[in-house]
Amino acid sequence: MKTNETYDKMAAIPHEMHKVDRSIPWSTTCYGCRPKEQGGMFIRAYYTTDDYVVATATTEEVKNGFPGVQHGGVVATYLDEVLWRQTKREDARVDAMTVETQLNYWKPLPENTEIRIVALPAEVDGRHYYVEGAIYLPDGSIAATAKIHYICLKLNDEISMEEQKREMRPVETELEEIYF
């Protein structure tokens, strides 16, 4: 199987319990976060004490590209939504937008499957954040990897000002540990 640097990093992480530092609030206007009944993806994410972001989600038939397999754009969205959370780890007021995504699909992402999306700690260079991560299938194998470049918006930017107005809600179920 062909691999790349991000795949190798993600494959080297031991599958074990990781202590949750805190859950990540979500917004009703967020496509990735809001409940499926409201058209969202219902991703729930957590910061761990070992500096990962770990999220859970369950794939569904309505987001298939081929029968039984999630659409590639949906796979990209799972990764973008979760990796982006590393930009807010130290300061929730930071607002960042995606500049570039390098994405590799390793295995089909089947429907009706609980997945884990994991983001490594960000590499930061001024306003630029570089985050790597993966989607794990229930058997621990990697379905997709990404390296995403984000840029932080300036505080007086119109988009950033609107983002600060969004109502954030707590995660419904607090976890002490999460496995990936």
Task: Indicate residue ranges for each PLM-predicted region.
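Short amphipathic alpha-helical face segments that pack within enzyme cores
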Residues: 74-78
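Short beta-strand micro-motifs enriched in acidic
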Residues: 46-48, 106, 120-124
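Short solvent-exposed loop/turn micro-motifs enriched in small/polar/acidic residues
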Residues: 37-39, 96, 126-128
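A structural signal for short, well-ordered beta-strand segments
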Residues: 55-57, 101-105, 119, 133, ...
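Catalytic strand-loop segment that frames the active site of acyl-thioester-processing enzymes
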Residues: 25-70
